[in-house]
Amino acid sequence: MDPSEYFAGGNPSDQQNQKRQLQICGPRPSPLSVHKDSHKIKKPPKHPAPPPNRDQPPPYIPREPVVIYAVSPKVVHATASEFMNVVQRLTGISSGVFLESGGGGDVSPAARLASTENASPRGGKEPAARDETVEINTAMEEAAEFGGYAPGILSPSPALLPTASTGIFSPMYHQGGMFSPAIPLGLFSPAGFMSPFRSPGFTSLVASPTFADFFSHIWDQD
């Protein structure tokens, strides 16, 4: 098929215009030729499909649960009227079942443990705990009567605290009109009362009679 006809769509006028546009200027190039050696080259065969990977783990299949019995299960035949008695005998609701069954060989260890717990008194430890509570309450009441205070958990009675020793506080003394170094010099001087740098709270502290009585009591002891 002429390419001009393909592009022109079959119209004669369009074909002529297309031929004019597709005219090659200059000599036509020589056709391509294939060398003889190239004909000897053959396409290699396809590679065979790779074998399945043997290292690949098999698909995961979930395992079914395995039931482990302490006692091998066995079938026990019983009628409807004897069903409750058979179940009670095998589960062991009392210690007398083992005596009747000749040692309880057909009874599971869990049933033996349950029967042992039922036979032993569970409230054996409760009286001991109650006795300890009574002893603690009695001790607290005796301490309250001795010290004359309400018993507490953290703080002891004030009467039981040791008295403060006389040397725990350093005495305040004055020599030649000089106060102790622990007290500022201008505390009781007129300059200290009239100082513009004093705070209102400090003035009220100095003017308090309780504060003055406290220091006079210490000075009288000296």
UniProtKB/Swiss-Prot annotation:
It is found in: Nucleus. One of its GO terms (biological process) is innate immune response-activating signaling pathway. Residues 1-61, 105-130 are annotated as: Disordered. Keywords: Nucleus, Phosphoprotein, Plant defense. Phosphorylated on serine residue by MPK4. The keyword Nucleus applies. GO terms for cellular component: nucleus. The modification Phosphoserine is found at S30, S72, S108, S120. A motif (VQ) lies at residues 83-92. Residues 12-21 have a biased composition (Polar residues). Residues 37-46 have a biased composition (Basic residues). Coiled coil: none annotated. Its main location: nucleus. Residues 47-61 have a biased composition (Pro residues). The keyword Phosphoprotein applies. Regulator of plant defense response. May contribute to MPK4-regulated defense activation by coupling the kinase to specific WRKY transcription factors. Interacts with MPK4, WRKY25 and WRKY33. This is Protein MKS1.
